[in-house]
């Protein structure tokens, strides 16, 4: 086998392996597609027992799980979890900082994945933090995506804009970041 043939064979094997991984993801049970969920359940159970160190460890484990899956859904879920941790004064500042970072990651993943739902969920996350400027930016990009998607997407964005304006988040969307 020549070097060129070997290179072609190796490329074919790599391509086949990649295709196999992609197809197997569709057949995986929901738990393996949402590996952060058990950690968040453990966090909530620990919070209910007022076991703050275990809750923090579980939240961190969920955070790590979202690094592996790289989905906006996981980032939103972990951001919300860190907001629950922020209800405890000793972790408030760090937890809110982490929640904000998770919502920002969710925003960029949603844009990359072409997910209008992800952009809207990111906007809601920032609204819950009171970050009006970033809510505006999320909704700005949601409007752009809604025009591309068509259908009822523009109406959905308008409804979210109105809903988030009711939370104190601004609805001005004139410039991007």
Which ranges hold each PLM region?
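Bacterial N-terminal signal peptides that target proteins for export
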Residues: 2-13
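Bacterial N-terminal signal peptides
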Residues: 12-22
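N-terminal leader/linker segments that initiate helical-solenoid repeat arrays
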Residues: 26-58
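Amphipathic alpha-helical repeat scaffolds of TPR domains
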Residues: 33-44, 71-88, 116-128, 159-163
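Short coil/turn connectors between adjacent alpha-helices in alpha-solenoid helical repeat scaffolds
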Residues: 44-54, 85-97, 128-136, 172-173
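Eukaryotic all-alpha helical interaction scaffolds
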Residues: 46, 59-66, 106, 110, ...
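Alpha-helical repeat scaffolds
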Residues: 59-61, 93-106, 135-144
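Terminal, low-structured helical/coil segments at or just beyond the last alpha-helical repeat
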Residues: 148-177
């Amino acid at each position: 086998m020549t070097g060129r043939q070997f290179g072609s064979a190796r490329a074919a094997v790599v391509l086949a392996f990649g295709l196999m991984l992609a197809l197997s993801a569709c057949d995986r049970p929901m738990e393996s597609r949402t590996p952060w969920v058990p950690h968040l359940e453990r966090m909530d159970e620990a919070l209910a027992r007022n076991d703050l160190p275990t809750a923090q460890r579980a939240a961190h484990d969920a955070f790590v799980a979202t690094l592996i899956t790289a989905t906006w859904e996981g980032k939103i879920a972990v951001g919300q979890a860190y907001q629950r941790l922020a209800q405890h004064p000793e972790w408030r500042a760090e937890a809110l900082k982490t929640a904000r970072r998770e919502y920002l990651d969710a925003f960029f993943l949603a844009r990359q994945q072409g997910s209008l739902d992800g952009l809207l969920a990111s906007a809601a996350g920032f609204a819950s933090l009171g970050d009006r400027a970033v809510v505006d930016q999320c909704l700005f990009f949601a409007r752009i995506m809604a025009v591309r998607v068509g259908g009822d997407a523009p109406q959905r964005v308008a409804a979210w804009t109105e809903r988030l304006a009711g939370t104190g988040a601004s609805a001005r969307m004139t410039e991007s970041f």
